[in-house]
């Protein structure tokens, strides 16, 4: 469909070819009706597409004469445009939403058939079609008639009213239009809702119960003000409708790419489940809320008591996840997975405990979460289900990871409270607590199920939960830093304890030596200080003490950095350290760079929306915490390579001083108690110890070697404090 400019109506009688009449927009003989799906098409799909910058060529039928396209109507036998579709919806022309979707498909297909694939108009049509498919994916699954088809002739009149009514339906969709009041509805219309109100049959199990006004109350004056039809859709949406795409559905045109190929919405609306549902519904005449989360879950849950500070924080996290800000990748998680509609026949065999954001919100509103950990467990269960069911390269998995990053970042900033240890804002807390929480959620859900299920079901559920745990741990292993820092930290701890004992034995001698050496070094230039620090591994015991005292004297940052990992996190990097970090990042293999980008984007709001493939890193603009996290990750990746140079250099030093040691071995063994490190016969441990306990290159080495995901940071920090104070 090439660019269109003017409607073909009113073409002057010019000799030569003329445009055929435009497609009909009303037909009294053709039965039509108003359904919740058609209302959605009118108020969400058409409205969204109409506002798009690429929509203008499709506003009106193609004017082949004006555009000089003599062969257009020979090639395109069924012209279609958005203006026609819009008018048909306004006139209740369609019987079901599938007819309307067919018109959209015809419009796009005509464009693709007539134009070349490289034409701009084709690219514009593709962009519109992608949005069209995304919106259709969110359409109500069950088609429910809003007005009976009987008063068809008169029923055209309130088309404008019905159009306004549609805005009530859109409460759970991103492009929401406020409901406009009904004006000047003729008295004939006032009886329509009454007719609609009579067939109030049973409501399917998954629909919330609706207060039904009695049929015997048809006061015409009140009805125009209270059009019973408009409020029906929110009731349908709130509980009974399953969103087409949940954790198994991507945003692209492959709506059901996860495990089913054909998009169900085209066939679903035709099913005759709908009969006459509750046409009048329970009518809360309130304009629809503008934000996504308010329309997603029924708001009937009354306040059952104040939320704790942590749960208030969790509630704000949930609201953010449901906000429009994250809608682009959060929408598959808004509603429970409708396995039947999506033809995912094995979904409930694989996923035993489905979870989604609307369920979490319902539980939050009804105060079902005793603490923040229960909330976090449900959120992580939702992501775990997604990772488990879908292949790792699936688009919905990428969306889940994005949304989980949002959650973990916010959850890590939980206000401190003694009871909530995993929620402390240490940088590694999300990762540590993540595994703990998923296991806790598994235990909770398995214990809940134990009371109601049989032994066999319990066993199968336990096996399934273990699989879930395994999937989460696999993901953790890929995302988290390698835990090779832990042994090093333990070793440092032992060495520090040993150091403390040595100090207790020969405290006076050590202090005397330390003072004398400190005075000598204080006179030396900064360059000499650096040289001494580099040679520190070959020096004797008290050089370690001297170095640590120098750091204390020169600036309190070094000693303060022992206090806690959090303080280490914020230590600024020197120019040399940044340069070294840059070199180390360049040494990383390609597959490790993704994590580097992830660390930067998760900690730097200004870079969060940048393209990961083309990100430019300016170390001068990065926060110290980001740089420290990068340093830890890079060191954990390069640790194996680093160990070899460390050991070889240690051997060289041992070889150099071997003869000396042989001659003075007895002397040095006698002085061993006076040494701070107590490692004269082995230079390697001394070097390792110094890199951790007395950082020769500045505070950064301390933070990189002593920071770990284990919970022993406080104990090692306190032991180093005591060693420094002495």
From Swiss-Prot:
Low complexity bias (residue ranges): 158-172, 247-261, 524-541, 692-726
Residue ranges, annotated region (Acetylated histone H3 binding): 77-79
Positions with biased composition (Basic residues): 486-502
Biased composition, class Pro residues, residue ranges: 14-25
Gene3D superfamilies assigned to the protein according to its UniProt record, in alphabetical order: 1.20.1270.220, Bromodomain-like
Keywords for this protein: Bromodomain, Chromatin regulator, Chromosome, Coiled coil, Isopeptide bond, Nucleus, Phosphoprotein, Repeat, Transcription, Transcription regulation, Ubl conjugation
Location in the cell: Nucleus; Chromosome
Entry coiled-coil feature ranges: 452-482, 646-689
Modified residues (Phosphoserine): 262, 280, 564
Bromo domain location: 33-139, 305-414
Stretches with biased composition (Basic and acidic residues): 503-522, 656-674
InterPro entries cross-referenced by the UniProt entry: Bromo_Brdt_I (IPR043508), Bromo_Brdt_II (IPR043509), Bromo_chromatin_reader (IPR050935), Bromodomain (IPR001487), Bromodomain-like_sf (IPR036427), Bromodomain_CS (IPR018359), NET_dom (IPR027353), NET_sf (IPR038336)
Region span, Disordered: 1-34, 147-172, 236-308, 418-576, 638-726
Domain of life of the native organism: Eukaryota
Assembly information from the UniProt record: Interacts (via bromo domain 1) with GATA1 acetylated at 'Lys-312' and 'Lys-315'. Interacts (via bromo domain 1) with GATA2 acetylated on lysine residues. Interacts (via NET domain) with CHD4 (via KIKL motif). Interacts (via NET domain) with SMARCA4 (via KIKL motif). Interacts (via NET domain) with NSD3 (via KIKL motif).
Family: Belongs to the BET family.
Domain statement: The Bromo domains specifically recognize and bind acetylated histones. The NET domain recognizes and binds the 'KIKL' motif found in chromatin proteins.
Protein name as it appears in the record: Bromodomain-containing protein 3
Gene name of the record: Brd3
């Amino acid at each position: 469909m090439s660019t269109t400019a003017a409607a073909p109506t009113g073409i002057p009688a010019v000799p030569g070819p003329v445009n055929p009449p435009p497609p009909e927009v009303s037909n009294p003989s053709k039965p039509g009706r108003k359904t919740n799906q058609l209302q959605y098409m009118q108020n969400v799909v058409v409205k969204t597409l109409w506002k798009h910058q690429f929509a203008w060529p499709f506003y009106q039928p193609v004017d082949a004469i004006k555009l000089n396209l003599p062969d257009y109507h020979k090639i395109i036998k069924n012209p279609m445009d958005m203006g026609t579709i819009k008018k048909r919806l306004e006139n209740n022309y369609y019987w079901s939403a599938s007819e309307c979707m067919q018109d959209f498909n015809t419009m796009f297909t005509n464009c693709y058939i007539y134009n070349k694939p490289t034409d701009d108009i084709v690219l514009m049509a593709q962009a519109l079609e992608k949005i069209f498919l995304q919106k259709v994916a969110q359409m109500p699954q069950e088609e429910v008639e809003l007005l009976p088809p009987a008063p068809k002739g008169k029923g055209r009149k309130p088309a404008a009213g019905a159009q306004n009514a549609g805005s009530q339906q859109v409460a759970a969709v991103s492009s929401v239009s406020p409901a406009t009041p009904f004006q000047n509805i003729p008295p004939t219309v006032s009886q329509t809702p009454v007719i609609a109100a009579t067939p109030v049959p049973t409501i399917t199990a998954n629909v919330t119960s609706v207060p039904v006004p009695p049929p015997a109350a048809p006061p015409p004056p009140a009805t125009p003000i209270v059009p019973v039809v408009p409020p029906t859709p929110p009731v349908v949406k709130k509980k009974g409708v399953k969103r087409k795409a949940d954790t198994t559905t991507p945003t692209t045109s492959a709506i059901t790419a996860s495990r089913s190929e054909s998009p169900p919405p085209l066939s679903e609306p035709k099913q005759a489940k709908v009969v006459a549902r509750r046409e009048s519904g329970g009518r809360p005449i309130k304009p629809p809320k503008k934000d996504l989360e308010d329309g997603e879950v029924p708001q009937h849950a009354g306040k059952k008591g104040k939320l704790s500070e942590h749960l208030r924080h969790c509630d704000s996290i949930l609201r953010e996840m449901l906000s429009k800000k994250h809608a682009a990748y959060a929408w598959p998680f808004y509603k429970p997975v409708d396995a039947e509609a999506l033809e995912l026949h094995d979904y409930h065999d694989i996923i035993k405990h489905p979870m989604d954001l609307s369920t979490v919100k319902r539980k939050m509103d009804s105060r079902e979460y005793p603490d923040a950990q229960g909330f976090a467990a449900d959120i992580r269960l939702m992501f775990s289900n997604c990772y488990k069911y879908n292949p790792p390269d699936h688009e919905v998995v990428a969306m889940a990871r994005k949304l989980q990053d949002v959650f973990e970042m916010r959850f890590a900033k939980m206000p401190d409270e003694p009871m909530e240890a995993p929620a402390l804002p240490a940088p590694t807390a999300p990762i540590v607590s993540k595994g703990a929480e998923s296991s806790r959620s598994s235990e909770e859900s398995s214990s809940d199920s134990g009371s109601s299920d049989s032994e066999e079901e319990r066993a199968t559920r336990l096996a399934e939960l273990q699989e879930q745990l395994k999937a989460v741990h696999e993901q953790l292993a890929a995302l988290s830093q390698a835990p090779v820092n832990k042994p090093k930290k333990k070793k440092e701890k032992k060495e520090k304890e040993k150091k403390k004992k040595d100090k207790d034995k020969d405290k006076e001698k050590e202090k005397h030596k330390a003072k004398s050496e400190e005075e000598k070094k204080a006179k030396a230039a900064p360059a000499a200080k650096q040289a001494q620090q580099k040679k520190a591994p070959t020096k004797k015991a008290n050089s370690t003490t001297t170095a640590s005292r120098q750091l204390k004297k020169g600036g309190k940052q070094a000693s303060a950095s022992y206090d806690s990992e959090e303080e280490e996190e914020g230590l600024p990097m020197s120019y040399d350290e940044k340069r070294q970090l840059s070199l180390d990042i360049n040494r990383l293999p390609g597959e490790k760079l993704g994590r580097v980008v992830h660390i930067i984007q998760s900690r730097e709001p200004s870079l969060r929306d940048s393209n990961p493939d083309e990100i430019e890193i300016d170390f001068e603009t990065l926060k110290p915490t980001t740089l420290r996290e990068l340093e830890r990750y890079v060191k954990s990746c390069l640790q194996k390579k680093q160990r070899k140079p460390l050991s070889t250099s240690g051997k060289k030093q041992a070889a150099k001083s071997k003869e000396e040691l042989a001659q003075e071995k007895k002397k040095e063994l006698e002085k061993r108690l006076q040494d701070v490190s107590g490692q004269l016969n082995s230079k390697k441990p001394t070097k390792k110890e110094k890199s951790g306990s007395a950082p020769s290159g500045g505070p950064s080495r301390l933070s990189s070697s002593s920071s770990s995901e284990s919970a022993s940071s406080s104990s090692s920090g306190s032991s180093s404090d005591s060693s420094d104070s002495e």
